[in-house]
Amino acid sequence: MDSVPSIRILTKNAVITSKYTLLKNHSKYYMPNHNLKDIDEDTVVKMYYRRFIRLRPLISRTRMVKETYTSYIRYKFKIENYQLKRKLVTGIEEQRPLIPTLQKSLEFIIKSVSFIPETKTIKFKIARDNTICRQVLKNLLTVEYQKENFIEKRSKGSELYQLLRVDFNHLVNSNNNLKFTSQLKVFNDFDMCLILMNETIGTRL
């Protein structure tokens, strides 16, 4: 029986097979090499935002996952009070510098979409690191999707949004007008673990 020939598509920007896409130019996903200290912080933050959004097509082939990722990035940059969320979990008042945490987060996402086979003959530690980043991002987006569904399907959706996305009351106690359900407990546990991971590796996921 003849084997099925592998599919390979060559474009100006990439080499595409049935399993992988090899990008010829990566520069648009990375921050420029010149000194960012000469640029005001708001402009630098916008530069990071654009690079996170550019990674969207590489996150998944599934439209739902890509849409969840886009919503997540927009929320992180435009709505979330990360310092409040961090304080509720760690008790730390002092803020971390924003730009270094964005850089670490960008590196994390780039690793998650970069594939290297895990074999002894190839750089195993790098491959394993990329795999772990990919698994964490997959879990993060799964929980983000569940949060959105949880908020949208409840009659008290706006109240849930305030609780989960603005005030983060699910991280501190169950003394609110909403029943502290098992689903809220899942969000509590995941968000606490995510914040603690950020503290460990310097990200802002």
From Swiss-Prot:
Organism: Vanderwaltozyma polyspora (strain ATCC 22028 / DSM 70294 / BCRC 21397 / CBS 2163 / NBRC 10782 / NRRL Y-8283 / UCD 57-17)
Gene: IRC19
Record's keyword annotation contains Membrane: no
Chain's role: Involved in sporulation and maintenance of the mitochondrial DNA. Is probably involved in a pathway contributing to genomic integrity.
Family: Belongs to the IRC19 family.
Keywords associated with the record: Sporulation
Name used for this protein in its record: Increased recombination centers protein 19
GO BP terms in the entry: ascospore formation; double-strand break repair; mitotic recombination
